[in-house]
């Protein structure tokens, strides 16, 4: 599309922002590391899902919906999964217990990301469906001298690769094993990492040339990206915490197995997330899952719509850290409440928003420009069509809510409850109900009954 500005992306590999030039404009390929399905995804996990969904949407707009391939994996073999299965399902055979954990967690992940307004990737491969592909890569690495067998394990020889460490820029003598599976003392070099590890009788395993075992963490993504995107592809994404060891080791495995100069041309990483100024952790008591945020009153004493969480994430540039807070969610909610409901539109997205997104996904500037469009869209059908197309590009299209009888009854009950709160001068709880309904696109209007003079509240769907 000639009118589309030049897309520039920051590349962690080069530490520079440069013009994006796909290997094949007819098939732009992107791989993003997905969840390990041992526990429900937390709000920090939501950030890469949202960031790379925006990039996916932008690439589809620039190159065409049928010319972009997006793969995001599911890691369903991991020691954390094994431990959770034994804890939650002690009465089941291990494989059945693992399946119960991974299926439940994966189902919840899909429900969560749908609530966040994310498009489905073209491919979402599971690690356990790609064991053969992993063993094939490992055999290649052994055959060309980049891996070795020690006490039944297969390890990658980091000193066999002259420029190992090119992504993280860390000297080899500072590198550590960096595997999720513990490595015993059979390594040639301190930084060597596990490709394949033997499994005991009470651990999941697959037959291989090196005995019954299971893969190391890093080899999974090398195998799945190769299968669905090829030896070399355009973009590899994930969180900043994955640069080392995970992405560094992916590069080493893939390049040495396939004899390529790169694995992916562009490496993109989103920044960290804190909660109310502190690192999110269970010990801090501020660990919040996406499900809890959207479906329970865990955070701020109320439920938050997925669109509010999405906008709250996009109000910070993806490479910057986010301090996640109730205040941030409230700010995003107030902004959304000012936007008109709109149907999907064939209009071209606004140029200022395209310019912002084309500058290394500058969603901060894009959201500011979108808000200006929203103000112009009230009462102007042409402006509203442009607003709708632009909001859709960000996954933020405000849709008019469909109200059925059951939902209407629930709203009526909340409105009645709020009136009782107001009569009791419990304004804090009354405001909570109003804010919750506003976030769902329902606007309240307070007034007085013309006959009795009593306070009454009416409501209508605004989006």
From Swiss-Prot:
* Binding site residues for ATP: 282
Q: Where does Zn(2+) bind?
A: 33, 221, 246, 250
Any one annotated GO CC term: cytosol
Q: Which GO terms describe its biological process?
A: cysteinyl-tRNA aminoacylation
List localization entries: Cytoplasm
Which keywords does UniProt give here? Answer: Aminoacyl-tRNA synthetase, ATP-binding, Cytoplasm, Ligase, Metal-binding, Nucleotide-binding, Protein biosynthesis, Zinc
Matching Pfam families, A to Z? Answer: CysS_C, tRNA-synt_1e
| EC number per UniProt | 6.1.1.16
Catalytic reaction(s) noted: tRNA(Cys) + L-cysteine + ATP = L-cysteinyl-tRNA(Cys) + AMP + diphosphate
Q: Which domain of life is it from?
A: Bacteria
| Top class in the EC scheme | ligase
Q: Which cofactor does it need?
A: Zn(2+)
What does this protein's record comment on cofactor binding? Answer: Binds 1 zinc ion per subunit.
The molecular function terms in GO held by this entry are: ATP binding; cysteine-tRNA ligase activity; zinc ion binding
Q: Motif 'KMSKS' region at which residues? A: 279-283
Instruction: Please report, in chain numbering, the residue ranges of the motif 'HIGH' region.
Output: 35-45
Identify its protein family.
Belongs to the class-I aminoacyl-tRNA synthetase family.
Which NCBIfam families did the record assign?
A: cysS
How the protein assembles, per its UniProt entry? Monomer.
What protein name is recorded for this chain? Cysteine--tRNA ligase
Q: Which organism is it from?
A: Rhizobium johnstonii (strain DSM 114642 / LMG 32736 / 3841)
